Amino acid sequence: MSSKSNPPSAVHAKSQLSSRLRYNPDSAQLMLRLSTLEMPVFLDSSHDQSNCGRFDILSANPIAHIKIESGRLRVSDPEIEISGIDFFNGIRLLKQKYLPEPDPQIEWETELPFQGGILGYLGYPSLHGKNAIEIRDAFVGVYLWAVIVDHLKQSSHLVFHPQCPTAEKTRMQNWLSADEDFQAALAPANFSLRSPFTKELSRADYNQAFKQIAEFIAAGDCYQVNLTQQFRADCSGSPLAAYLLLRESTRAPFSAYINWGNGALLSLSPERFLKLTGTAVLTQPIKGTRPRGDSIEADERLAAELCASEKDRAENLMIVDLLRNDLGRVCKTGSIKATALFDLQSFSNVHHMVSSVSGELADDRDALDLLSSCFPGGSVTGAPKLRAMTIIEQLEAKARRAYCGTVFYLSANGNMDSNITIRTLLWQQDQLFCWAGGGIVSDSDCDAEYEECFHKISNIISVLQEQEREQEQEQEKE
């Protein structure tokens, strides 16, 4: 692992901390190229030019990292003591050692979201005691350079943290500025399924779990519980090839691909968790879903049905109130506002109902305080959060692992953005895991909730299984 360089002795100009690269509207080629390096991370807007999907962030070769897989912890730096119970403090220790406070006079590229810093993901936690959580699946790394692709301004930038060694800066500038055509040389490796996806929860078990949640709600124990189920398939080949295949059919503004060597996360998430810009906080929970229609008329009818649904509005408002409460722990009193309620956002296979809540971070708090205060996101737990999480642990047969956690960046300039890892797969030991779920409330219908799980995951599963069928047909022709 590279050693920490000395702090900068003079103010860095923008020209020293970033350089221009040739713009390509499709970041797939950059992903392929950087995938040859260690532990690549791609935060992928899928070329969505909306305010929430303008930038792609790509990096690799972290100077230090932490990973946990099913509770097994590995830290690249033995001097950093960390546990799953105190994981956020471990991230803080990593940040303090490898990302010391920069010179306040540094001229950052203020428009670019990431200036070097922390990139990674946190899986859905388990409960530890009455009020604490334990992170059992995660990967976070310290990345001192990144490629930022701005699809709105059609520009690409190679950015560096002030601690990035000069030799590494020169190497990356030369390598990424080369004019060679890498498209043919870096064609992705093949990916194929070796078995169809199978659900790990029988219909009878789902019905029983639904019934128990309904009883908890009727007794006043909780108002909403997010019930999920796991799907699994055997596979072979490159997880990046699978991700690139999926992103062609499932465009989502908070997509991500992370590979930590013996595992990879493939996320096609449409949902923002938390964003911090300066002291401005934004969270945008999704609650309420309808499938896309087979015709324009059917699609418009389903979208209108979602917008008019009192049930979906009530569920959405429950989560808005939960997030207002979470933000209240770290934001200035009186600053928290619901700036938009029940907006319609449409994606390739579903319509979603989305709300927006904003606040101003308190003077004595930072991005890690914000993340730890609100994690996991209320849209994937239920309300009240701790009681819903207790019920989830009691009823769900399989751990959620990467699902319902967050992929995030924490930039050296203090800014942060993150997703909720829905529509997300975990690749490990030639197996693919994915999950789907929904919020159960007092008037939920068991059949409808069960079907909604499949609406949410159907596009992902069908794309990968169709790829397998096409490969089999090609082999038969040969």
What are the residue ranges of the model-derived segments?
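Extended alpha-helical targeting/anchoring segments
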Residues: 1-478
